[in-house]
Amino acid sequence: MKNGYYQTKIRGIYKYISDNLYLNRPDVEIKGEHFNSTLLFSLLTGINRGKELIIGEPGLGKTTSAEYVGSILYRYPLGVIWGSEVSGHPEQTEEKIIGRPHLGELNKGKERVVWSNFAQIPVKIVDEINRLPETKQSMILNGVDRGNWEYLNEILINDEYSLFATANYQDRGTNTIIAPLIDRFDVLIESRHPGSNIAYIIGKEASSNHPLRHPQYEKELHQILRGDKPYEEKMTLAEGVCNLFGDYLKEHLGLEGLNKDERNNVNEEMVEIDFDLDTNAFVRMALAELSFCHKYGQKRSVEVCEEGCHYTGYLCHHIKNCASNRLPISIRNYAQALAWFLEDDGVDIEHVRLIIPHVLAHRIQWKDSYLSKKEGEGRNDPFQIYLAKEATEEIFQRYNEQREYLLDALSVGYRAFAGEEVTPLEGDHPIYEEIKKDIGVKDEKPL
């Protein structure tokens, strides 16, 4: 169903949360519209089944914003969301996160797993993930990446899920999020202070009666999740209760979330949205700067690009690691989700310019020399997001300068790849060397 039917529902969720639950200032603009980035990206995460890392100071709504989006979008009462969250702390165990043995069956000499609510429901929230010790972060790698949860000799596979994790800024109680885990997050967002005037209103209107609670449906869902039925059957029963809660939200709050079929329909609509020619070329140029190394063949975190390289003026000289293959997937999924949300016919450069800094900020490892050079600059964003925004605009400027020539070079590359005898175009950017590699032409530039 097109013509804005689902988008109207999602915009209704955004407006209700923004007006009533997560009071905020808009901090991003696209296509003449203003949005709060935390709320916008949380909704995009929910509809495209993504993974979002929300950073910020304590008490600024990192966890609550994700709870509200997950509750309304997936139509789970807030009490179930609360009861399914995982808290990050040093004593956290696999049994609390994923599942535990069924003690009754264990006494009979049988193995059976009692899965946690976190592993079962599609809305997954990890609060203060950077308080998990690095050794315990590995426990959730496969679950975070693929929705596969393993315990004893059993496996539970989620057919749909969205992950929201929060992290405070570094202090004595936090740990570094390991590289394999941080790379699995699609986007990094900051939950910002709303300003003194809005903060005063929040304090004035705080209430213990939450409109997203429903004790009866919460009890029914907890009973289903604790039951002995097969996982697929439990999810079917849970969806029935969620539909009842959805009816309640519509009747009492005028809110419409999405049932499972509708969420599937939205995903089908999003994947049909194509990138236009300019956006395709711009993303390729960005990926080239984030993975190319003239001296060593590609970026590697264990190899240092020295001064004097021919490509000193590009991002590849300022970073230590190579962009993973998850990066273009994140760009595509979130750019399509944003274009769908705005009801645009295709993904254009304006969409990806908004998306790229947030899919890049947590993945890129900058050289210390570059960090020292930039850290004193004034900014409105946390340092890592600021650097990613600056990098995106640098690439965009280079793209505008070379647009026509780059499009010609890509066209020649396509023809060569198809078997035509052509000479690849020369250019002073890593993307031209990548085109040569793709068609088997040796790079002649000096190391």
Model regions and ranges:
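Canonical AAA+ ATPase core
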Residues: 73, 104-109, 128-136, 146-255, ...
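Conserved alpha-helical scaffold flanking the Walker A/P-loop in AAA+ ATPase domains
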Residues: 41-45, 103-124
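Walker A/P-loop
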Residues: 43-88
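Conserved P-loop NTPase "ATPase switch" module shared by AAA+ and STAND
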Residues: 118-134, 140
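C-terminal engagement/docking regions of AAA+ P-loop ATPases
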Residues: 53, 58-67, 292-447
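Basic, amphipathic alpha-helical bundle interface domains used for macromolecular binding and assembly
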Residues: 32-37, 215-370
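Conserved NTP-binding/hydrolysis module of P-loop NTPases
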Residues: 84-108
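Pre-Walker A (pre-P-loop) alpha-helix and adjacent loop at the N terminus of AAA/AAA+ ATPase modules
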Residues: 4-58
